[in-house]
Amino acid sequence: MFDSTLNPLWQRYILAVQEEVKPALGCTEPISLALAAAVAAAELEGPVERVEAWVSPNLMKNGLGVTVPGTGMVGLPIAAALGALGGNANAGLEVLKDATAQAIADAKALLAAGKVSVKIQEPCNEILFSRAKVWNGEKWACVTIVGGHTNIVHIETHDGVVFTQQACVAEGEQESPLTVLSRTTLAEILKFVNEVPFAAIRFILDSAKLNCALSQEGLSGKWGLHIGATLEKQCARGLLAKDLSSSIVIRTSAASDARMGGATLPAMSNSGSGNQGITATMPVVVVAEHFGADDERLARALMLSHLSAIYIHNQLPRLSALCAATTAAMGAAAGMAWLVDGRYETISMAISSMIGDVSGMICDGASNSCAMKVSTSASAAWKAVLMALDDTAVTGNEGIVAHDVEQSIANLCALASHSMQQTDRQIIEIMASKAR
């Protein structure tokens, strides 16, 4: 809970972070479907005998190639099956945290028996949509999630409607934290980070705890593309320098390796994405350790990173053709710049250089290769900080970068929200043709 003595704007900032920075076990798109299946199973009379599911094209894109924790299998069907048979309906993005070996075996058996289907919802005007319908004989229960990974909008069974989310806002109800955040600025966020009482933001240290554990697991070399472990080996061979820059990349990518490879450890997510949470966290942690920062400085830097990442991503569709590890890394750049220098000018220059560098990176679905994009984004963030410390940045004379960092962010988000929609359709078409 936040301190009620804080000014109302700061309270909304803290609520925004508490809503958007949460533990998540497994890639959040398959997990969203697993949650829908788990909630449906909880409403069903009797054991689940069959699962049908429908998802948006974007959710299908992010579910085709990612490993579901504990299963050793990729894809949405195993996520739906395990959610239905072993999911914790009350655990949100950690829906699979209590899945037992027996539940995993049962889910695989259900899949092998041809009792699980996942299709693209047609037509579908939602970017993030998942619906799971579970059956026991003629009895059924159906749950629909729209707009957010855990945002359940409808629950229905063979007996009738159980729940429907009301779309209207009650008179006098406060605006959502994200709505308030959309009207703020980076300068106001920095003022908050500098002045808010440490006790009010201490909770953000949990992001370091969770994501550092994931990073350590990734360094075992057992997960995904083991980029972090591979780069660490190359340091030992003398092919890569073991310095601050390489440590940022190694420890950040290792966490993503474990995350995407199916490790049964939660990530602290950001904006509904574990990789975004990792990218907003690990570079800041590594730099903080390098400078011997205490818990308070680390918490302030992490708060700046996570809140800046949320602020930028809030101007984007929830899922798009733009790899959002890049926008999370813009938050990391802000956090690292604050640790080293602390000036608004340095922070804004670092973000502008990031926009001039990695803004064109596409999202071609969640998979082990996400760790490559995470490592690239983390490296670019530190490079942008180093440039800013030398009073150098991509300027408003170049590309989509404007003279003002707020306009630069708006330009990037407009590109992702509008022009890249066709890119997204092309990516989904290519991936669907591979899956056939």
Curated annotation (Swiss-Prot):
Pfam families per UniProt: SDH_alpha
BP-aspect Gene Ontology terms: L-cysteine catabolic process to pyruvate
Listed GO MF terms: L-cysteine desulfhydrase activity
Family of the protein in this entry: Belongs to the UPF0597 family.
Name by which UniProt lists this protein: UPF0597 protein YhaM
Species in which this protein is naturally found: Escherichia coli O9:H4 (strain HS)
